[in-house]
Amino acid sequence: DQMLLANMKRAGNVPTDVILFNIDSKASLDNLDGKDKILSVFEKVFNEKQGLSTIPHVAELERFLIKNNKYEEFKEAVSKECGEDWETARNDFYFRRDEIVNAYSKVMNKSQEEAENWFDKAEENYDISIEKFAKRIKEYIEANDKKHVVFLVDEVGQYAGTDSKALLNLQTMV
């Protein structure tokens, strides 16, 4: 069918970011039975794709800093405070509290108390939903010249298994 072939060629010419992963290998052990266990893995790999932290509330901080054109300045401030680059220090986020708080305070022109309060409540205040995640993907697409994003997920059926919450989570995302 010529129409089908033309559509396939047209689809093949659209710039696309492909995110290929095995869901089980990317899953966190702390969310194996949560209702959003599939969403959390998708969020993690999407953050990785953008060069952000795999820790959700840390990635949220990075998005905030990027949006406010403070990310590079923050990374430099963390490097001065920690003696290592941000990409390394963020993996030890909880052990680098004082250095990160100091850097955030300086870069965002916040008091030490405000920065400490932010740090101490960042994880607790972080919330993600499928709707928020979809908006993030939409923003990413719009910021990247309408480039498509395709998630190719291996072993998702086995990962969800007979967990009705996980299956509903997957169904809602798709």
Write out the residue ranges for each language-model feature.
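P-loop NTPase motor core
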Residues: 1-92
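Glycine-rich, often proline-containing surface loops adjacent to acidic residues and nearby aromatics
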Residues: 13-27, 113-118, 146-158
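Flexible loop/turn segments at secondary-structure boundaries
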Residues: 27-31, 107-111, 157-161, 167-168
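Residue-level signal for secondary-structure boundary elements
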Residues: 50-54, 112, 145
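Short, flexible helical or helix-coil boundary motifs
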Residues: 72, 107-111, 144
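Long, low-complexity, polar/charged, intrinsically disordered or flexibly structured peripheral segments
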Residues: 79-133
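Conserved Walker B catalytic segment
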Residues: 125-174
